[in-house]
């Protein structure tokens, strides 16, 4: 009995090292996916007609993109996001709201999905994100008012801030 315990204890450091290495490889692979999806969200944001901010969002579930969105005016409205004074019109939809609306109109569900977004969500969008069942939000730039992030954290949504998204070639 004592011999097998001794063998077990001597193998423990090697086992621990193996588990740590596995976790690092898995984390590294996940970070590559996160950065790739965030780059896609960045490209999607370029489709926005808004002059002040161009924000893109991608919803991913089981490594499949199930929705996308960018900030802009609702369907049927002229594509001018700012008024004559340069302020954003009140009815402009945020990127994440557009992406979540598309999912709601489809056969898909956001339950357990990840939202990739170029600008962290505002308070209103954070409520939609939580209610939609999204479990993880990866964002590039932090919005000046971080109460949306605080709400999501309190709701148990995992948050990942990736300020640098260029690929390591």
Protein language model regions, located:
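Zinc-dependent deaminase catalytic domain
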Residues: 4-169
């Amino acid at each position: 009995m004592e011999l097998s315990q001794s063998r077990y204890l001597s193998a423990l450091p090697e086992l621990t090292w193996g588990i740590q290495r596995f976790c690092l490889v898995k984390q590294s692979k996940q970070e590559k996916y996160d950065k790739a999806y965030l780059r896609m969200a960045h490209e999607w944001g370029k489709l926005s007609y808004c002059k002040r901010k161009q924000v893109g969002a991608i919803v991913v579930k089981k490594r499949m993109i199930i929705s996308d969105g960018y900030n802009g005016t609702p369907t049927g409205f002229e594509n001018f996001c700012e008024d004559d004074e340069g302020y954003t019109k009140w009815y402009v939809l945020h990127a994440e709201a557009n992406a979540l609306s598309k999912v709601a109109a489809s056969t898909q569900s956001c339950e357990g999905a990840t939202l990739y977004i170029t600008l962290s969500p505002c308070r209103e969008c954070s409520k939609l994100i939580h209610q939609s069942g999204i479990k993880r939000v990866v964002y590039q730039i932090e919005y000046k008012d971080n109460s949306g992030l605080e709400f999501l954290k309190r709701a148990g949504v995992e948050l990942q801030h990736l300020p640098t998204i260029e690929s390591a070639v």
